[in-house]
């Protein structure tokens, strides 16, 4: 499918919003501030991303993950039919971003190795597809649609008393309750981490990211002493996320090599066997360290 290219267009310069929330702020105001910051980050990185900058790609993916975390955090308060449509479009965009980012990570971990050239070629192809997507009308319709939804989507005008009440709840009340819920769910999901399969482990990693970002954008919205306790959880979450991320990167890299037949096991079975032993040992070490971190998160 060929994507229609969007002509050069003059983007609206949007004012910078305050970074932090306040305890008395209404939830609907806080939600708009958080989502606006995420979208501004996407816009800031767009030009560099379209030029192939790996750092801009990474920052764009973080901004979009934060955006999805915020929408999940506010949940029924903001979910509506328009978000369902926009979420589907975001999934389309994320597929291009993810394919290119996976190759960036694999290349970084393969410097000087024989497979580096193969990965560079695959990265060029993946980026061309990403750039075409970023220049398409479909992308800009999604991006402008997100701004419209944040400012005046169906969620903003629901008239039933419960919806209006939810939107008006102070940040300090809602965030304290919601963070506790998410923390409890993560503690439950992370039990038995060392014996988990990759799918369950992936869900722990996603839940970790969401809780991490939720804590980060709660700064200012909770009393200082309450936020201090979450800051300690945040420190462990970052470390746990790093370890699970390394495991994920290893698995992605292995899949890339397998799909491209990078390892000729018939010709060099000894080398392949040595590589598998090394991978199992590294995986065991990372899982052991991650399990210790998640026990601290649950304390």
Where are these regions (language model features)?
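Function-determining surface determinants
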Residues: 1-299
């Amino acid at each position: 499918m060929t994507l229609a290219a969007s002509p050069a267009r003059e983007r609206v310069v949007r004012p910078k919003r305050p970074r932090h929330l306040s305890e008395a702020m209404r939830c609907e105001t806080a939600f708009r501030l958080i989502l606006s910051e995420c979208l501004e980050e996407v816009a800031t990185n767009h030009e560099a991303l379209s030029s192939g900058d790996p750092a801009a790609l990474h920052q764009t993916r973080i901004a979009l993950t934060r955006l999805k975390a915020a929408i999940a955090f506010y949940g029924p308060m903001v979910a509506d039919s328009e978000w369902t449509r926009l979420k589907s479009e975001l999934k389309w965009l994320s597929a291009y971003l993810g394919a290119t980012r996976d190759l960036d990570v694999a290349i970084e971990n393969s410097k000087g190795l024989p497979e580096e050239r193969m990965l560079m070629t695959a990265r060029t192809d993946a980026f061309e597809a990403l750039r075409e997507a970023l220049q398409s009308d479909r992308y800009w319709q999604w991006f402008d649609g997100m701004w419209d939804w944040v400012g005046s989507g169906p969620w903003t005008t629901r008239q039933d008393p419960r919806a209006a009440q939810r939107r008006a709840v102070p940040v300090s009340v809602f965030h304290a309750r919601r963070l506790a819920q998410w923390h409890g769910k993560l503690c439950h999901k992370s039990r038995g981490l060392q014996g988990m399969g990759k799918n369950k482990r992936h869900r722990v990693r996603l839940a970790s990211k969401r809780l991490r970002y939720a804590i980060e954008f709660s700064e200012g919205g909770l009393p200082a002493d309450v936020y201090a306790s979450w800051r300690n959880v945040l420190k462990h979450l970052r470390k746990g996320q790093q370890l699970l991320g390394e495991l994920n990167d290893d698995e992605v890299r292995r899949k890339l090599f397998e799909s491209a037949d990078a390892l000729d096991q018939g010709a060099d079975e000894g080398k392949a066997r040595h590589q598998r032993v090394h991978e199992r040992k590294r995986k065991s070490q990372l899982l052991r360290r991650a399990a210790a971190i998640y026990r601290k998160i649950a304390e």
